């Protein structure tokens, strides 16, 4: 396995000139955010991810209204819990530029971590799915100093450790401290940064930037709507 590290010059990425920027994630008032969330939850509050139901431990839940209570240590990550689905754009060394669909699941089981799963599929020029793209899974943790740890595994042969912090109540920035690529993994994947944030529409936006040469360049970004939770 090969390892890369990230330079210590953090960059706050945006979602692009054609859409809301993640730097706008704190621009909505608290009361407006609550009202918007209440309206949107009318179609998502009754849904949850499936569980086996016969385990001697709690099933994962992506709906804060169901299952075990969220651990007190995760309150700074609470807005992420749910299932999010939408579309994004990629510009990678492996596959060039393309559009993709994505579903992200943030779930918990009452313990002091969030589980994370991302599934992606490529889209053609008409927006039709053409096949499976990338998958990721991992865990988010945050300590009493609001320091976030994100362990992320990629199905394509990458394991990464990110550290970061909340930028505000609706945005979270992460920087890769270790990017390990297997012998069959993407040798061109450099270290990078990610920013996740709730837009004024309460959609979840995220941006992944990677080191190319001496500069960080956008690799992937997406705008996702809550479908569960």
Swiss-Prot record:
- Sequence segments annotated as region (Disordered): 1-54
Q: Which InterPro entries match?
A: Calycin (IPR012674), Nb(III)_bact/plant (IPR022939), Nitrobindin (IPR045165), THAP4-like_heme-bd (IPR014878)
Pfam families listed in its UniProt record: THAP4_heme-bd
Tree of life domain: Bacteria
Q: Where is this motif: GXWXGXG?
A: 82-88
Bias (Low complexity): 18-33
Family affiliation:
Belongs to the nitrobindin family.
PANTHER family attached to this UniProt entry: PEROXYNITRITE ISOMERASE THAP4, THAP4 PROTEIN
| This protein's name | Ferric nitrobindin-like protein
């Amino acid at each position: 396995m090969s390892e890369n590290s990230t330079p210590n010059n953090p960059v706050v990425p945006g979602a692009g000139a054609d859409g809301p920027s993640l730097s706008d994630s704190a621009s909505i008032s608290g009361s407006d955010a609550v009202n918007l969330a209440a309206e949107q939850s009318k179609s998502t509050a009754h849904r949850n991810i499936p569980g086996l139901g016969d385990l001697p431990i709690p099933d994962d839940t992506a709906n804060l209204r169901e299952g075990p209570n969220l651990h007190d240590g995760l309150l700074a990550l609470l807005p992420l819990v749910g299932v999010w689905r939408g579309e994004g754009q990629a510009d990678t060394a492996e596959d060039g530029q393309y559009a993709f669909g994505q579903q992200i699941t943030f779930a918990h089981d009452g313990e002091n971590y969030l589980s994370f799963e991302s599934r992606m599929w490529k889209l053609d020029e008409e927006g039709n799915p053409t096949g499976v793209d990338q998958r990721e899974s991992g865990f988010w943790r945050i300590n009493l100093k609001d320091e976030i740890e994100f362990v992320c595994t990629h199905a394509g042969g990458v394991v990464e450790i990110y550290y970061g912090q909340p930028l505000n109540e609706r945005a979270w920035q992460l920087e890769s401290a270790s990017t390990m690529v297997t012998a069959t993994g993407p040798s061109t994947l450099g270290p990078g940064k990610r920013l996740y944030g709730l837009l004024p529409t309460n959609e979840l936006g995220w941006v992944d930037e990677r080191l190319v040469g001496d500069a960080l360049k956008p690799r992937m970004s997406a705008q996702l709507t809550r479908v569960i939770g």
